[in-house]
């Protein structure tokens, strides 16, 4: 595979939070049982003036800061999300304009449930590797919704991260050693046009959906690269909740030291398309030169994208040029359920 890597990355997380106890109280549920079952304590909530576009813009600006490049050289911007503000009006064009990348570029909004952001990374890898563009930007961001009283309401959250892909060795903070995808037609989670909330297959979302795809993608990339779990310093997986993430990591043989930096769900919730991009951003915030990372996304419907990544010495030069993911995670203000339903537009008049 040609030399292709990450030259900049940035993240964004809204400051508002709601605790599991606050939601459970309204529905008469046992918060301790929910926290234990999901391994989630609280989740992020976007303010009324935040949506996928504003989250993507903030993450993109932070990525440009770390990359230290002229945004006009970005030849492609892809925003992966299942909560684009408009059905017809691209989020990607708004982001490109906001960072000063227009007009000489291609842009598109992507959808593949929670893995649309990583699909964008693969697309940028292809365009950069072919020489068609100098830099590409891929963003995974969402303001996820869960129906009132549904299990998703305890986890569906907001946040995102952006990655700038390039091929100049002296600019790369991390190199892609390889990528692999695993895709099938698996109807575990869906939402039709015009519907406010998604529907899901309950327990069917586990073994035949999430675990089948994540584990096969992880095994596929390791077979392709000739590696084992011992070759990786860090790993990150899609995290609809903390329980699935930890089970997937342990079933592959990863230790707590390897998977803990990528696990943000307990204090963030499930950011859908932003989940793996945000988890990876936190790993990069902590990683040293030479660290090897296994990243595996998952999108319902269903598919997983896997990446084998090695961090370069340049990481230490850029990590402090933009807010770190944990700094954004720790910048928080708690709200009650009444404010939450107001902010999320759940009160229908």
Curated annotation (Swiss-Prot):
Subunit architecture: Interacts with acetoacetyl-CoA thiolase that catalyzes the precedent step in the pathway and with a DUF35 protein. The acetoacetyl-CoA thiolase/HMG-CoA synthase complex channels the intermediate via a fused CoA-binding site, which allows for efficient coupling of the endergonic thiolase reaction with the exergonic HMGCS reaction.
Residues holding CoA: 203, 243
Catalysed reaction equations from the record: acetoacetyl-CoA + acetyl-CoA + H2O = (3S)-3-hydroxy-3-methylglutaryl-CoA + CoA + H(+)
Highest taxon of source: Archaea
Keyword Transferase: yes
Pathways involved: Metabolic intermediate biosynthesis; (R)-mevalonate biosynthesis; (R)-mevalonate from acetyl-CoA: step 2/3
UniProt-annotated catalytic positions: 82 (proton donor/acceptor), 114 (acyl-thioester intermediate), 238 (proton donor/acceptor)
Key words of the record: Acyltransferase, Isoprene biosynthesis, Transferase
E.C. no: 2.3.3.10
Biological function: Catalyzes the condensation of acetyl-CoA with acetoacetyl-CoA to form 3-hydroxy-3-methylglutaryl-CoA (HMG-CoA). Functions in the mevalonate (MVA) pathway leading to isopentenyl diphosphate (IPP), a key precursor for the biosynthesis of isoprenoid compounds that are building blocks of archaeal membrane lipids.
Bridged cysteine pairs (disulfide): none
Entry binding sites for (3S)-3-hydroxy-3-methylglutaryl-CoA: 30, 114, 205, 238, 247, 270, 300
Protein name from the UniProt record: Hydroxymethylglutaryl-CoA synthase
Enzyme class: transferase
GO biological process, one term: farnesyl diphosphate biosynthetic process, mevalonate pathway
Family: Belongs to the thiolase-like superfamily. Archaeal HMG-CoA synthase family.
Keyword Transferase among record annotations: yes
GO molecular function: acetyl-CoA C-acetyltransferase activity; hydroxymethylglutaryl-CoA synthase activity
């Amino acid at each position: 595979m040609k030399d292709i890597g990450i030259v900049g990355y940035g993240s964004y997380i809204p400051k508002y939070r709601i605790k599991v106890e606050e939601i459970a109280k309204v529905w008469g549920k046992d918060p301790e049982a929910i926290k234990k079952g999901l391994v989630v304590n609280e989740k992020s909530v976007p303010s009324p003036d935040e949506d996928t576009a504003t989250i993507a813009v903030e993450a993109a600006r932070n990525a440009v800061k770390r990359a230290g490049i002229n945004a006009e050289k970005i030849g492609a911007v892809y925003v992966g999300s299942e909560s684009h503000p408009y059905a017809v009006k691209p989020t990607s064009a708004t982001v490109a304009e906001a960072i000063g990348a227009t007009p000489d570029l291609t842009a598109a909004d992507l959808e593949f449930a929670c893995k649309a952001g990583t699909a964008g990374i693969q697309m940028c890898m292809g365009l950069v590797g072919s020489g068609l563009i100098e830099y590409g930007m891929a963003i995974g961001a969402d303001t996820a919704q869960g129906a009132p009283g549904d299990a998703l309401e305890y986890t569906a959250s907001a946040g995102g991260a952006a990655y700038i892909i390039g091929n100049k060795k002296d600019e790369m903070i991390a190199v892609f050693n390889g990528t692999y995808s695993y895709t099938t037609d698996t109807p575990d989670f869906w939402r039709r046009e015009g519907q406010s909330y998604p529907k899901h297959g309950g327990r069917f979302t586990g073994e035949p959906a999430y675990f089948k795809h994540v584990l096969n993608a992880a095994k596929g990339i390791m077979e392709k690269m000739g590696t084992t779990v011992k070759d990786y310093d860090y790993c990150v997986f899609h995290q609809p909740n903390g329980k699935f993430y930890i089970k997937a990591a342990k079933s592959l043989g990863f230790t707590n030291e390897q998977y803990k930096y990528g696990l943000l769900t307990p204090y963030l919730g499930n950011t859908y398309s932003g989940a793996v991009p945000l988890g990876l951003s936190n790993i990069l915030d902590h990683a040293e030169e030479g660290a090897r990372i296994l990243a595996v996304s998952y999108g319902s419907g269903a598919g997983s994208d896997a990446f084998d990544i090695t961090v370069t010495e340049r990481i230490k030069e850029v990590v402090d040029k933009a807010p770190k993911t944990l700094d954004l995670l720790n910048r928080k203000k708690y709200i009650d359920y009444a404010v939450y339903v107001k902010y999320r537009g759940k009160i229908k008049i």
